[in-house]
Amino acid sequence: MKTIENYNIKIYTDNIEDNAVEQIKELMSIDVFRKCKIRIMPDVHAGAGCVIGFTGNLGERIIPNIVGVDIGCGIYVRPFVCIKDIDWHALNEFILHNIPSGHGHRNATSAPLPDKYMDGYREAKEIVKALRCNRDLKDNKRLYKLIGTLGGGNHFIEVDRDEVGLYYLVIHTGSRNLGKQVADIYQKLAIKCQLGWAELMEVKEQMIAEYKAAGRKSELREAIRQLHCSFKTKKPAVPQELSYLEGRYRDDYLNDMRLCQRWAEINRQMIAELITDWLVAQGSADISTCEEKPFESVHNYIGLDNIIRKGAIAAYEGQKCIIPLNMRDGSLICIGRGNTDWNCSAPHGAGRIMSRKQAFNSISLDDYAKSMQGIYTESVNEETKDESPMAYKPKDEIIGNIKDTVNIVNVIKPVYNFKAAE
């Protein structure tokens, strides 16, 4: 474990890059965050705008960049009983034709959603319409077609098996382009607020109310024009990437973030239902007799207790959670210990030891393929080398670092893996 002098920070690993430490220090150098209790998870690595593995309560301020662009991303786990050998190639073909991935969306080349999934589709569509930032979204019609689709990069569909022979369908994906757009909209707003835009809006609203009350509505347009002309931006007190929201803009962000979380939840469950329905129709899976219930672990969000988890999951006492390791080694199923010193959190994965660029340049396709022997996958290719097992921290390192926050109750190993390129 590492600490950073003069701050209430604990980093639950010794394996952390210098630039990740600098990202943490940059945030804590901002006066309003200096005294915050920050806990960094063992899968820590540098990220875009904020370190991955960040947890903390930032009070009445929100930095959209910390939550990031894949709001509500998470992993959904659907246990099932396998009653007949699964045709893995047929499953792969089903996914390719029914679950668009990467930059794909539902269009003429993908199979239409069956009627039984229309309730989920309609709810997802209403979520997009209900966003407070809806007017700033681009291409809403395409957003409607993203439900039931898988992201690229580290997102995946897996079928895993445990030591007693129970199977698990594991879905890792998030809010897709919807979450990215919402994150970008609010980060731009946060930057504007640091330049004085929020104060300008307050003056403008007060002016509108006063002019209307005085019966001077016809003069408003010119008065507002002059107000904007006289506005001078102030020098921002924080770096652009750490700009924050307060007050009603914070409330707007929280509202839309939670809607994106719900959208991502629907997305994962729809993918899981599509696949389990296919497995049942093939006579390969029995869902009804499986005593284990589905569950999910979400990262990239702000909890109701105001804890931000960026690349981290909740691990409250008794909470079931999943920590994926890599494409070869599978995942840990755990029960949270509710350790408040960890902000009741756990890592959302093993954590990268290579950047995507490093992985592409240093890992050979042959080594990648050898590492995946024994697992059925048609996804081992040049475009997914950045997700090979060697790009991630060793499983034993993560297992050794999490004993104070979770109890490991099961290890599930992949027998099938599907992954799309970024």
Each model region followed by its residue ranges:
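Acidic active-site catalytic centers that drive phospho-/nucleotidyl reactions
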Residues: 42-43, 70
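Domain-length cofactor-binding catalytic modules of enzymes
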Residues: 2-26, 33-40, 46-54, 61-64, ...
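A generic, well-ordered mixed alpha/beta core segment in the N-terminal half of proteins
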Residues: 66-130
